[in-house]
Amino acid sequence: QEYAAEEVVNAIHFIEEQTGEKFDWDAFFKSMKRFNAETEEFLEWMEISKTDYPQVMGVTLALYRYGVYQAAGGRNQAFLDMDKKLTKMALDAYKNKEMAAKEYRHRAMTWGVQAAYYTALPIWLLNCWGVVTIADMLSMVSTEMVNTEDKHQAMLDLAYLYENMIMRNRSNGGYETGVEALWRFCEMFNIDIVIMYVHMGCKSMSGYHGLFEEEARKHGIHLIWVTHNLMCPED
């Protein structure tokens, strides 16, 4: 962890040397406070998703979260303002026991290398089959807070988040984060179906194929493989 934090600091020093600019700790801590607040809102949605009346879910959760933690990163107040609006709407809908479909027959988790720009599948599953997608693999990262007082601890925390980003964690991070974590989320959200995406142009999780099937049987989880090659630049 110290090594990872050192690499972040080295990157900061390199940019300072090349540009002549100095790293603004005040601006950084301000962004991280906002980033932490965004994370807290997300965790609130996930608490609701553990119940029978999930609200922020499916592609609504997925596409929005990608923008929040990957692109905005606490730098834009508009995202936090929207987070708070979403939380209020979600809490109101939860209290009223509102549902996105007439019936939820199954609770699903999407895993694997998904097509972030192809949003029709979860909507089709919900409207035609009553399969509600509670959460997805790419949304379940960046859930830890960054220290906003101590510079060294802040670098350690930031490095941890970088270490646990999508391809460094789930798809290329090994058995514990790629396979074992899935079943923890299934238990957390009472999932009974896993939609396992297989990207024909990205084979990073293909070696786990048999392990996923074996573990799914052990946990009593239905596993559905969805092969795609969407949004591939070679096409």
Where are these regions (language model features)?
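Trp/Phe/Arg-rich N-terminal binding region typifying the photolyase-homology
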Residues: Q1-F23, S139-M140, E144-D235
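A charged, amphipathic alpha-helical module
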Residues: A5, V9-V146, S171
